[in-house]
């Protein structure tokens, strides 16, 4: 099992380089991804041990802020967020390896994107370790274009269909349901793919699906960035982007499993919260003007069948 974990780690660290390099090619000023390698000390007072590399870009003309973060951690006991629906895992040691990214563009016409790909092994030090994969990618537009959502979902479907034709409808629905702000009765964006507890096939089959899915993120996102990054925008557009970013913050702090897991398990707070946007605003009881571009967004981000 250790060999398989290391193989996935090697894939993720290479993927991190591929993604940051591809994004930097679209940046028009001197902003670059900065590498912040870290290691948790292996001492008794540390609940979580391990290491990682958080790559951050800030202040770009295209990417106002972005993080592509790798981590490999282990602990003596899974936190409550990981065992709430799987009580049989309570008290088990674990290893978790993953890559998580969030890209916050400066231009309100370029959507925010998020992706995460991970493996968990519970009881890795026992004769019967329990493994599963999780991950996916989702898109959060502020001023949406239907062709962007169609391209995003078509890319997702193509990858899923290559492995299992039941995956796309199942993981799309899961994504729609997961990225939902219950307290607002709003969806975060136009979705994509979300899956967890993936071990329905052999390890190699699941590994191949997850790595193909991870490799397809750039195919899904880069054409949208290239198409929208030079659209002119006004302060009104920027203000609405900042307002909608507030919803992003609310979701990450209240509902996101990865954030909650990281904080509950004693993870590296600076890396966990690096996905937060550089700026966001909240307005009391604000409502978009009827018939405005802003009002249309709320109809657009409801779940729908993007691929006819």
Swiss-Prot record:
Supply the PROSITE patterns for this chain: COPROGEN_OXIDASE (PS01021)
Active-site feature positions: 114 (proton donor)
Q: Where is this site: Important for dimerization?
A: 183
The residues that the entry says bind a divalent metal cation are 104, 114, 153, 183
Oligomeric state and interaction partners are given as: Homodimer.
Query: What this chain does, per the record?
Result: Involved in the heme biosynthesis. Catalyzes the aerobic oxidative decarboxylation of propionate groups of rings A and B of coproporphyrinogen-III to yield the vinyl groups in protoporphyrinogen-IX.
Which protein family is it in? Belongs to the aerobic coproporphyrinogen-III oxidase family.
Q: What is this protein called?
A: Oxygen-dependent coproporphyrinogen-III oxidase
> Sorted alphabetically, which PANTHER family does this protein's record hold?
COPROPORPHYRINOGEN III OXIDASE, MITOCHONDRIAL, OXYGEN-DEPENDENT COPROPORPHYRINOGEN-III OXIDASE, MITOCHONDRIAL
- State its location(s): Cytoplasm
User: In which residues is substrate bound?
Assistant: 100, 116-118, 266-268
Q: Which cofactor does it need?
A: a divalent metal cation
Q: Name one GO molecular function term.
A: protein homodimerization activity
Any single biological process term in GO: protoporphyrinogen IX biosynthetic process
InterPro entries found in the cross-reference section: Coprogen_oxidase_aer, Coprogen_oxidase_aer_sf, Coprogen_oxidase_CS
Query: In the UniProt record, which is one GO cellular component term?
Result: cytoplasm
Is the Metal-binding keyword given for this protein? yes
Please state what class of enzyme this protein is: oxidoreductase
Q: In which pathway does it act?
A: Porphyrin-containing compound metabolism; protoporphyrin-IX biosynthesis; protoporphyrinogen-IX from coproporphyrinogen-III (O2 route): step 1/1
Query: Pfam families in the record, alphabetically?
Result: Coprogen_oxidas
Q: What EC designation does it have?
A: 1.3.3.3
Question: Sorted alphabetically, which keywords does the UniProt record give?
Answer: Cytoplasm, Heme biosynthesis, Metal-binding, Oxidoreductase, Porphyrin biosynthesis
Q: Which reaction does it catalyse?
A: coproporphyrinogen III + O2 + 2 H(+) = protoporphyrinogen IX + 2 CO2 + 2 H2O
Primary residence: cytoplasm
- Which taxonomic lineage does the organism of this UniProt entry have? Bacteria, Pseudomonadati, Pseudomonadota, Gammaproteobacteria, Thiotrichales
